[in-house]
Amino acid sequence: MKTNKLLAVLLLLLPFAALQTEASRKKTTVWEKPVTMYANTGTIEVTRVEFADTATLLYMHAEHTPKEWIRIAAESRLTDADGKTYRLTSADGIVPGKRFVMPDNGETDFTLRFAPMPKGTKMMDFAEGEAKDDWRIFGIHDDSYSPEIGLPKELKEKKYEGDETLPVTRYAPGKVKVRFKAYGYRPEMEAKVYGWYSVLGEKQQRRFAVKLNDDGTAEVEAELTHPSVIVAGIRNVNYASIFAVPGEEVSLALDLANGQKDDAFFGFTGSLAHTNKVINGNVSRLQRLFMSSYDSLMTTGTDGWSAAEYAALISKTLKEKKEAVNSFKGLTDAARAILRMNLESTALGWQYDFSRSWEQAKIRRANIKTAAEYEELRKSLNVPHFDAPLTDVTPMELLESDYAMFGNGLSSAYSYSTPVVINNAYNRQVATVEAFLKGRISLDAAAEATITDPALSSLVAGKRAKDKQLQEELARRGNVFFHKLDDVKPADILATILDKYKGKAVVVDIWATWCGPCKAGHKRMKPLKEDLKNEDVVFVYITGPTSPAETWLEMIGGIDGDHYYLTREQYGHILDTYESQGIPTYLVFDREGRLTFKNIGMVANDKMKEEIEKALEWL
């Protein structure tokens, strides 16, 4: 009887409890899709905000290197538009002030609980700690809210009239001034305009980082060698691709309140302003016109497919995408040409990467579980290799048009040992000169005679003069071998190097100037070298033309050992011989020149010392 009465009471209370729950829910204001105006970090982001009576909750997502740690300072705070601060009170999923080690997938979620803010709050800032370099996220607001940041209506709604075509492109160096304005910017953001652009013949892109003025403006000066692309923007917000011509001035503006949307950039000026607007203003819509991953296409293919069948798939995909570009409404002729050349560049890249993608597709379908299984399968695969494109890929705008340099794709002509044929005489000269400047090819007298354009010819002469000066300087260094072994056949190059050190153990470090792990390895090995300085061991460093000679020369001054700068073919042969899929690659040879140890990637000093000591033992 008592049980029945208790049940009756509970049933009567249920509606009341439901009402209480509903009332509590209504007291909580939620931003389901918070956006930010600027963050000085890409490691953490706010995914949801809740305003309750007792607390303001920020739901956070973090991405960082697996097994490395992050930390949220106990002093973290929120600040509203009036400057009032709300301190961190507790957290779930992370302990404030303590190191949190990232899981194997490099991602984690946690919740930060702050003192309650007014539920009518429209925008807030987050500061993780008090130090200058601690994480900061500015202008957090709900996606439905549009902050007033003083956007000039006439600029935001600027009309771009008329069509535009790409200019005839020639090597004609000149400066481009880029005027940048970020609306919604505040001095405390301390942001910079970052960007990059390519220069004919230079192996690495030129980069810039210019601090924004207090009013959100900045000026960047780029030295272009021909009409081409300058990428500029604010890190963790957005980047614009600006198509510019040497000698002109261009401008653009960024709406930080909508920084990650298609219409974030506006107010373009310059000879291709309309083209810049339609490309940067339609990024999401244009995504479907891009080529998808070639690796994915190959993975879905049949094991029995031939190279010709894969090539046919590439051609079919390229044709379909080009047709989609040509029918896409609202683009200028210049924008269509740029998009078509981008597709052609991707198609050439797919052909160039055929062997790698073919191998990776086979490995994916094999469902490899361990490193041993991976190595075993790799040895059993008969990977096809090509010294020329799978099919005749010409004619292409990327190679044959009078604006081909704009797409910066002529360098792809020498991606193969058998170059892609270019019929346009000027473009052929550009491709040859660029390949020479980047160290991909050498120029004999007959080849140099084909360079008839005076400006391009002067580039060749300048490179030869610089190389001569460099060689004279390096000749005075007994431990540096810059192109001194060019006449040695690739198959004999490593034996020729090792013969010099018979009777000693040799550690070979295959590296490049642009390789971060390689440079880290050089620093890490300094104590090891000091420890072994009285032993019969030599450290040999090998690189090739992917490393700019001037940069290489500067860097090797701080690396004890013998340094070899080889030809592309010699360098590639060593990597192929020792099945190196990456750098740094470390090889240890004993006193008789026999390989005793190989490792791709970082090696602990203790392990390396152990292997060197084994190599030093006389058999």
Q: Model segments located where?
A:
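Conserved redox-active cysteine motifs that mediate thiol-disulfide chemistry
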Residues: 510-527
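Conserved segment of the thioredoxin-like fold in thiol-based oxidoreductases
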Residues: 530-571, 580-583
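Thiol/disulfide oxidoreductase modules built on the thioredoxin-like
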Residues: 569-613
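Conserved helix-turn-beta segment immediately C-terminal to the redox Cys motif
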Residues: 504-505, 522-543, 614-616
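Oxidative protein folding and maturation machinery
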Residues: 168, 173, 246, 256-504
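A non-transmembrane, solvent-exposed segment enriched in polar/low-complexity residues
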Residues: 139-334
